[in-house]
Amino acid sequence: MAQLFFRYGSMNSGKTIEILKVAHNYEEQNKTVAIFTSGIDDRDQVGFISSRIGLKREATPIFSDTNIFEIVANIKPKPNCVLLDESQFLEKEHVFQLAKIVDDLNIPVIAYGLKNDFRNELFEGSKYLLLYADKLEEMKTICWFCAKKATMVLRVDDKGKPVYTGEQIMIGGNDHYYPVCRKCHANPPIK
């Protein structure tokens, strides 16, 4: 029986590398995967997933008007698994489409993404994945500053000062965001 998985973690918890690993494992067994990513995330190039260790792979970009269910339903042969990167950027309707892929097409869907933003609020995609996923799995990493478990994301400005207000989405990497524990989120030891 297919299920909808939400594998969430802070930055640097290995979400993208895990997608690449899962895709490789399916393909090693001559099974097919459909890989999607947010069209918002243009750090490297729209339509690609890219890990911080340098591995990169093409993926179908998701925009506001993208119907993920229709795309997957029309793939021949039917994929054995659907993988999504940056799923925090999904909209509510996209999450419903993922559930429909699982329920109507009997294809497992594994969505990877951040749970909460730099203000420690849920992203829309994460909120609905937390509500609708059959299985929730935390991917762990350590705090940038103290090595406790990182559960939050700290945003810094161009001068390295912590930022706790502003637009939820600002695409960036390690130059503007850090995985942190709760204590270091509130009082980051930044010099």
Curated annotation (Swiss-Prot):
Residues noted as binding Zn(2+) in the record, renumbered to the chain: 143, 146, 181, 184
* Listed Pfam families: TK
The UniProt record lists the EC number as 2.7.1.21
Q: What biological-process GO terms show up in the record?
A: DNA biosynthetic process; thymidine metabolic process
Q: Which EC class is the enzyme in?
A: transferase
A single Gene Ontology MF term assigned here is: zinc ion binding
Q: Which UniProt keywords apply?
A: ATP-binding, Cytoplasm, DNA synthesis, Kinase, Metal-binding, Nucleotide-binding, Transferase, Zinc
Q: Catalytic site residues?
A: 86 (proton acceptor)
Tell me yes or no: is Isomerase among this UniProt entry's keywords. Answer: no
Catalyzed reactions per annotation: thymidine + ATP = dTMP + ADP + H(+)
Instruction: List, alphabetically, the GO terms of the cellular component aspect.
Output: cytosol
Domain of life here?
Bacteria
* Alphabetical list of InterPro entries matching this protein: P-loop_NTPase, Thymidine_kinase, Thymidine_kinase_CS
**Localization annotation:** Cytoplasm
Residues bound to ATP are: 9-16, 85-88
UniProt record similarity statement: Belongs to the thymidine kinase family.
Subunit (UniProt) = Homotetramer.
**Protein name as annotated:** Thymidine kinase
Q: Which organism is it from?
A: Listeria innocua serovar 6a (strain ATCC BAA-680 / CLIP 11262)
Q: Which gene encodes it?
A: tdk
